[in-house]
Each structure stands twice: as C-alpha cells, then as structure tokens.
Amino acid sequence: MIDSLNTLVPMVVEQTARGERAYDIYSRLLKERVVFLVGPVEDHMANLVVAQLLFLESENPDKDIHLYINSPGGSVTAGLSIYDTMQFIKPDVSTLCVGQAASMGAVLLAGGAGGKRHCLPHSRLLIHQPLGGFQGQATDIDIHAREILLVRERLNHILAKHTGQPIEKIQHDTDRDYFMSATESLAYGLVDSVLKQRAEISL
C-alpha cells in the first residue's frame, strides 16, 4: 500500500485445492473485509482505499467493512473522497484507530457507521482547522483564503454531525490543535467505544 514499504510487507502462504497461493498481508486481510488507511492521506492512497471500499461493496453489499486507521492526516480533498465513499456505499464501514487519527484521519474515524467507531486504549486523536498556503497576486490569495474558510466550515459541520457536539464547540475546539486520548475521544463523540480485547469486536 505504501511504495517505500513494499519490500517490508510480509507474505502469507495458503494451501488451496490447486496448491499454494501467496498473498501480501494487506491483500489477505482484504479478503476478510479489512482495509488499512495508514500514513499521510494523499490522492494515491485515497484512490486505493476508495477502490477497495467499492470492491468490497460489490462482493457483498450487506456485510460490514472494517477500516483500520493510523494516520497523521493530510489532503482534505483526498480525505473527503474517502469520507464521501464511506457514506455512499451500502455496507456499514466500521472504523478503528490504531496509533493515531489526526486531522483528516480523525474526520474519517468519526465518519464510520454509528455504534461501530472504535479506538484502542493508547490511541491519540487530533482535530484542528485545515492548513493551507498560497503565493500569488493579492486577488488570488483572497480567493484561496475564502476557499479554505469554506473548507473549514464544511469539516466542522461533518464533525458536528458525527460527534453530536454543537457547531459552536467544534469551531472553538478546532481553532487550534485539540488533542484527545482514547477516553477523551469517547466522551467527545469521535468514537463509540475504546476496545481492550479482541472479544469486543468481530474483526
């Protein structure tokens, strides 16, 4: 999934009626409807995640998909393409934070199906306003400034929708970096449970 780590991805060998078959670990887990969102959110990674979500929907539109997130965030447009696909497809998308879900990663974690958003005990979550920079003529800078304010408003409304927090609180909290522990994110409404053991979740 991440080019720089391709040589480090372990292979799994399975015995089939036709002999042995080797999978990389991510492809094997995809058979179990597990999708990994790891590292910075950018266009290539987002396209891979979207493609996997659409594939799993076509395989079985009535069975949950499990999205595991360990991400520092990244591109808003790339992240929103994943978010929109999660809302668009028929299967529920269960989200689970392992490590961190920061910025756009936190938005995607919160965007999972209600009652099916989880994190592990030592997860770290971060919400904040979108970052951006632009150089050019004053008029163009003004155009981009207005656009990033619209993006901030859109993201705040998404967080308010999924957390149940008032939009005013979301606006206040995202004005600066707002870190949360697993238990704090549960109280905030970003997740529905903090998991400690495998028995608490099916996958």
Swiss-Prot record:
Cellular localisation: Cytoplasm
Top EC category: hydrolase
The keyword Cytoplasm is annotated on this UniProt entry: yes
InterPro entries (UniProt xref): ClpP, ClpP/crotonase-like_dom_sf, ClpP/TepA, ClpP_His_AS, ClpP_Ser_AS
Family the entry assigns: Belongs to the peptidase S14 family.
Complex and partners: Fourteen ClpP subunits assemble into 2 heptameric rings which stack back to back to give a disk-like structure with a central cavity, resembling the structure of eukaryotic proteasomes.
Protein name in UniProt: ATP-dependent Clp protease proteolytic subunit
Gene that encodes it: clpP
